[in-house]
Amino acid sequence: MGEKKKILIFAHYYAPDTASTGQILKDQAEGMLEEFDVTVICVVPSYGGTIEDRYKTKKYYFEELNGVKIIRVRVPEFTKSNKISRVKNILAYFFGALGASRKAGKQDYVFTISQPPILGGWLGVLGKWQKHAKMIYCIQDFNPEQTIAVGYSKNRLVLKLMMIADKFSCRRSNLVITVGRDLVETLKNRFKNKNLPKYTMINNWIDEKEVYPLPEDNEDVLAFKKKYGLENKFVIMYSGNIGLYYDLEKLVKVLKQFRKGYTLKGVYESGPLTTDGREVVFVFVGAGSVLDKLVMYTKKHHFENVIFIPYQDKADLIYSLNAGDVHWCVNAKGIKGVSCPSKVYGIMGVGKPI
């Protein structure tokens, strides 16, 4: 067998961070090792905004995880609800990743994702030029379309420049990957079906050996329920990023109709009950830019049957997902064709209704 081809992956987040794209890229990177020499460039573990002291002293950290070479870029801590701190964090990764790529040596391929928005694509383009390599651009979310859909920015000039920049990244790619059929249509619409870049569709996934259905009496599932007060409850769960793109603020306002003390046929003073007598509770597992708003709203309106649980380690994801009786998989209005909710794969993995 000849020498392996080399591929450089700009991941933004990577294991052990709990970001869904980081977990997917870990699976991908490790799955490519038989045929490729794989190097990943990412931030130091910091998805929650805080950083361990051991990752605060050097500019770059060189590691290896399960055969994958990793160059971690030091970035400043941030607060997900603070735009300025997030921008500083993202720019630190962008410029740090460019510097890290020079330390990655010769590469045959550069693989990048659409995160951070726009800049992820530009990392791929600049990495391609720097390495004289072929570029693969995996679009998990289309921007500025996503930014427009949630009203994050209404500055027409900024949005126009974002579109020009990301279309440039698409055109410079040797292959564009989208993660859903609707995203393919969005790509076609961007270019009005003319001079389309070469593209293919590859869905995201879940490892069915790691996330699968468990019986209700599984000890670890019961331990999770006990830890968070979910015993003998009917659990309606949202698990994932509690961010802008899911309209969770409106969802929580609807839950006002189901709080304890609300009386309606089939809904008792203790709160809504199932036919077998279990109290219905609404559980949000994760973190994100709107989490604090949701917590404040539920406290203000005395929601006693809404529970917030921190992100779970990937090893524990199987237990938290199995603890839900029904799962929400929601997107904000306008997100169709712009983003594909990868959380659906975990829900299907444990065999729960959506």
Residue spans of the language-model regions?
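Nucleotide-sugar-dependent
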Residues: 246, 310-320, 327-349, 353-354
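An aromatic- and histidine-rich active-site surface loop
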Residues: 86, 90-102, 109-133, 137-140, ...
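Carbohydrate-associated surface elements
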Residues: 44, 182, 202-205
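N-terminal subdomain of nucleotide-sugar transferases
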Residues: 1-66, 253, 258
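Nucleotide-activated donor-binding/catalytic signature segment of Leloir-type glycosyltransferases, i.e.
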Residues: 267-268, 276-279, 285-286, 291-318
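Conserved donor-binding/catalytic core segment of Leloir-type glycosyltransferases
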Residues: 223, 230-246, 252-256
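Membrane-proximal helix-turn-helix segments that form the acceptor-binding/catalytic region
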Residues: 119, 126-130, 156-178
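A short helix/loop element that forms part of the nucleotide-sugar donor recognition site in Leloir-type
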Residues: 56-60, 212-229
